[in-house]
């Protein structure tokens, strides 16, 4: 295999990431590669021994994940991020989130280590009104995330407090001078 991109360069000076990018670019969008196949082609191109590749493999895999030009496509297949429009990537993420919403959520059963199967023991954990967010005066019952007016009120309240604080600070500075 010969990569025209590296014509005139010494193979020993090339990084595995550079070679991986060149291999994927040459193959094109419809030819994503399994990680193992990609590593084998890199090894063949760079003419490295198995022991050299094994030693460099953890670093290469980390670089592949960190480098922004590669994208994992699932099932250990890799491609170039430039092959995919941002909308395509986002749709895949949204699809996964929608699947999670459809799945029924299981409630976790609370286990009390002190109950130890004793039917006569009193469980004080279920009758504490402070454990519930629905008691009168609760912040969560007054604030509605969906209501933009609540957010506006919160910002105005913060601004008022901030203004008062700066006024007090200025007054204190004048008193000290």
Swiss-Prot record:
GO terms for biological process: DNA-templated transcription; regulation of DNA-templated transcription. Residues 117-164 are annotated as: Disordered. Residues 117-134, 142-157 have a biased composition (Acidic residues). The keyword Transcription applies. InterPro entries: Asxl_HARE-HTH, RNAP_delta_N_dom_sf, RpoE. Residues 14-83 form the HTH HARE-type domain. GO terms for molecular function: DNA-directed RNA polymerase activity. Keywords: DNA-directed RNA polymerase, Nucleotidyltransferase, Transcription, Transferase. Belongs to the RpoE family. It comes from Streptococcus suis (strain 98HAH33). Participates in both the initiation and recycling phases of transcription. In the presence of the delta subunit, RNAP displays an increased specificity of transcription, a decreased affinity for nucleic acids, and an increased efficiency of RNA synthesis because of enhanced recycling. RNAP is composed of a core of 2 alpha, a beta and a beta' subunits. The core is associated with a delta subunit and one of several sigma factors. One of its GO terms (cellular component) is DNA-directed RNA polymerase complex. This is Probable DNA-directed RNA polymerase subunit delta.
């Amino acid at each position: 295999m010969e990569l025209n991109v590296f014509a005139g360069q010494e193979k020993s000076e090339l990084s595995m990431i550079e070679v991986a990018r060149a291999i994927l670019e040459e193959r094109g969008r419809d030819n994503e590669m399994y990680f193992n196949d990609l590593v084998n082609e890199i090894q063949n191109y760079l003419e490295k021994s198995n022991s050299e590749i094994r030693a460099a493999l953890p670093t290469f895999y980390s670089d592949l994940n960190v480098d922004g030009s590669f994208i994992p496509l699932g099932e250990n297949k890799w491609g170039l991020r430039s092959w995919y429009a941002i909308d395509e990537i986002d749709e895949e993420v949204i699809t996964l989130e929608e699947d999670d919403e459809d799945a029924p959520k299981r409630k976790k059963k609370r286990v009390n280590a002190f109950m130890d199967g004793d039917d006569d023991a009193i469980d004080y954990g279920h009758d504490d009104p402070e454990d519930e967010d629905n008691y009168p005066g609760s912040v969560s019952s007054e604030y509605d995330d969906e209501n933009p007016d609540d957010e506006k009120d919160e910002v105005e309240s913060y601004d008022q407090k901030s203004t008062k604080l700066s006024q007090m600070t200025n007054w204190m500075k004048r008193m000290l001078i």
